[in-house]
A protein has these predicted regions:
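Short acidic active-site motifs
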Residues: 67-68, 90, 204-207
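Short, surface-exposed amphipathic charged segments that create phosphate/polyanion-binding patches used
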Residues: 52, 117-122, 175-176
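Long, compositionally biased, intrinsically disordered segments
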Residues: 5, 12-17, 28, 38-40, ...
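Extracytoplasmic substrate-binding proteins
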Residues: 13, 57, 70, 74, ...
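Alpha-helical, coiled-coil/dimerization segments enriched in small aliphatic residues
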Residues: 171-206
């Protein structure tokens, strides 16, 4: 597999294979460089990307289990952003064997919410919006600090059950204190609710 590469000039064509990346492009007003993604229009909550998917300027390329490699190749992306899970690595290796350049997006390994947010700076470096990315982090950090200052004087601190629901199977994935969402809840003065026997960052509960 290819583990290094060189891009001449500003990136104008990318494919992103994780939904968490999409918001970064939108926040940098750079959705126009996204030519393919792993989000269907009906499942997309990033307005500018949803519009791009609907008008055809960006296309759905499938997910790791059903990726359309021929479609991706036809888009001729300068770079493909992938996650760092084992399934993502397998997909990236296949794409790299076809001569496509993949960049691993490691935000999933961050334990702190601000650490995850700062990955927007990687996108900024690729699309020639470094300063805009840094400004975005600085401005949002200031807003977060304002909220946290107000939290300090709050008399009540909630308990929070944070979960995602699977539409393909009857269960809920409840987040634990090993997940980065705990940094959000605890910073805001809350306490995350989860089964104390849990050892991973989430635990599956059936309906």
């Amino acid at each position: 597999a290819q583990w290094d590469g060189k891009i001449e000039g500003e990136v104008t064509s990318v494919v992103t294979l994780a939904s968490s990346h999409a918001g970064h492009f939108a926040n940098l007003d750079a959705v126009d460089v996204v030519k393919g993604c792993s989000i269907k229009p009906e499942s997309c909550y990033v307005n500018s990307l949803k519009t791009a998917l609907e008008n055809g300027s960006a296309v759905y390329v499938g997910t790791s289990s059903s990726l359309d490699q021929e479609l991706i190749a036809s888009l001729a992306p300068q770079v493909i952003f992938v996650g760092g899970m084992s399934s993502d690595v397998e997909v990236a290796q296949k794409l790299e064997e076809s001569g496509l350049l993949c960049v691993y997006f490691g935000d999933f390994a961050e334990e702190d919410y601000m650490g995850r947010a700062q990955w927007i700076e990687l996108i900024g470096a690729f699309v020639n919006k470094d300063q805009q990315a840094r400004d975005f982090i600085r401005e949002n950090k200031a807003q977060v600090d304002e909220v946290l200052a107000k939290v300090q004087s709050a008399e009540e601190h909630p308990s929070v059950l944070w979960y995602t629901h699977s539409s393909s199977a009857p269960h809920f994935n409840v987040r634990t204190d090993a997940d980065y969402v705990n940094s959000i809840v605890s910073a805001a003065g809350g306490r995350l609710l989860f089964p104390q026997s849990a050892q991973d960052n989430s635990i599956k509960l059936s309906n």
